[in-house]
Amino acid sequence: MKIFAPGRFDRLPDAILFDTDNTLYPYDPAHTAAQQAVRNKVVNTFSIKPEVFDAAFKEARQQVKTRLKHTASSHSRLLYLQRMLEIMGLGSQVLLALDFEQTYWRTFLSNAVLFDEVKDL
């Protein structure tokens, strides 16, 4: 590897971030389980039909992606869920949005199963 600015690499980094989706584990099963858990929680919390959740979430996701374009935050479940609550006429419900986001990630992580080829450290 050719380093064009060696002066910028005079020490080891404090942390390295990398995308693990479909590298260490399959993304789709974990995402599907997490999305279903959030859907169930929202449907039960507000006594709405699943289709209402589906439509509001889809619209919220599209609006966030359109507004934030190609930024990392355009993938934020928290922003999707907060906007979904607004679309549903519930206004700014930050604590609910956080609760729903935590449900997503808790379920996602508990369903993210490593590929067989991934070695134990």
Q: What is each residue range found by the language model?
A:
Residues 24, 42, 61-68, 108:
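Short amphipathic alpha-helical interaction patches enriched in hydrophobic/aromatic residues
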Residues 75, 112-116:
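Conserved phosphate-coordination/catalytic loops
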Residues 117-121:
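Catalytic-core regions built around general acid/base machinery
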Residues 103-112:
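Surface-exposed cleft-lining segments at the edges of enzyme active sites
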Residues 2-18, 23-56:
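Active-site neighborhood of HAD-like aspartate-dependent phosphohydrolases
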Residues 59-102:
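A metal-dependent, Asp-based hydrolase signature
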